[in-house]
């Protein structure tokens, strides 16, 4: 069994990309379980064709404790027999969102949910790789990380930040970077830009996912493109990405770059963001550094 994880900046299309890709992998005969590790709990809705799955933390709070739950309470089966679990998170401003991830994974392991699977996929928020969100990496659960990014400044900044988190645990937990997935935003020279970023991070751009209205049309019906329009070219893009993940042997220890090098890369491609966007990056960087200092 291989344990993979999809990380990416909020709003980059990480959950949509992962669900479409995993749907294609399941259709090819792989036995898959998705563990949603994003407080939005939107990691499984396209597989289950529903609004949002009830989370482990929500049910545990209702029942009194996670020990009072049965596996059947939190594990649902969706498209192509993909098993689905959402860990959930606390109310905004209260507690650590990583608590739900830790609680869920421990519960699933104890209840035997990981048996008879080819892939377990963790769908993880990745704006800041704090201790909780880094848990699948830190505890050696996820062995292959795929970062969903685009040619936009904030998405690339987040990808580099995630690479830093992977590097931190690469030597102790054995986690590796499997590649960057470029979820296109139709930015100028986007393929070349992400290929160069991947090279600097000591990885590969494993696939370029073109932008398509078909994705939104499928989402309106709470479906993946694989389910909604299996013959559409966009469905084949996700199948191709899934095949590349299945056959991927280029698993590396990343070499994150500093902010000056990232800025230089954006300038070289004529894509440096506005002053407002630059301020956001600096604020996010200071917040990330404060979190790192607080964790020591």
Swiss-Prot record:
Residues that bind [4Fe-4S] cluster: 96, 130
Cofactor(s) it depends on: [4Fe-4S] cluster
GO molecular function: 4 iron, 4 sulfur cluster binding; ATP binding; metal ion binding; nitrogenase activity
InterPro entries: NifH/chlL_CS, NifH/frxC, Nitrogenase_Fe_NifH, P-loop_NTPase
Binding site for ATP: 8-15
Alphabetized HAMAP family for the sequence: NifH (MF_00533)
Similarity remark: Belongs to the NifH/BchL/ChlL family.
Identification of the protein by name: Nitrogenase iron protein
Gene: nifH
């Amino acid at each position: 069994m291989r344990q993979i994880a999809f990380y990416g900046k909020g709003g980059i299309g990480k959950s949509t990309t992962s669900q479409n890709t995993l749907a294609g992998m399941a259709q090819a005969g792989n036995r898959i379980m998705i563990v949603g590790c994003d407080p939005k709990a939107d990691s499984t809705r396209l597989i289950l064709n529903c609004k949002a799955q009830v989370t482990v933390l929500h049910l545990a709070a209702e029942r009194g404790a996670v020990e009072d739950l049965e596996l059947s309470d939190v594990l649902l089966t969706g498209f192509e027999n993909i098993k689905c679990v959402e860990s959930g998170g606390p109310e905004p401003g209260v507690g650590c969102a990583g608590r739900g991830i830790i609680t869920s994974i421990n519960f699933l392991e104890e209840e035997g949910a990981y048996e008879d699977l080819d892939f377990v996929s963790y769908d993880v928020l990745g704006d800041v790789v704090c201790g909780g969100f880094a848990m699948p990496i830190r505890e050696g659960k996820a062995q292959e990380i795929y970062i969903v990014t685009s040619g936009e400044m904030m998405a690339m900044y987040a990808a580099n930040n995630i690479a830093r988190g992977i590097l931190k645990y690469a030597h102790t937990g054995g986690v590796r970077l499997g590649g960057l997935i470029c979820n296109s935003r139709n930015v100028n020279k986007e393929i070349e830009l992400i290929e160069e970023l991947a090279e600097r991070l000591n990885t590969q751009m494993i696939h370029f996912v073109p932008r398509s209205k078909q994705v939104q049309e499928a989402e309106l019906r709470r479906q993946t493109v694989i389910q909604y329009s299996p013959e559409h070219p966009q469905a084949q893009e996700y199948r191709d990405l899934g095949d590349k993940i299945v056959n991927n042997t280029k698993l590396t220890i990343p070499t994150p770059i500093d902010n000056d090098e990232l800025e230089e890369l954006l300038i070289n491609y004529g894509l440096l963001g506005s002053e407002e966007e630059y301020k956001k990056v600096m604020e996010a960087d200071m917040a990330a550094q404060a979190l790192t200092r607080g964790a020591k």
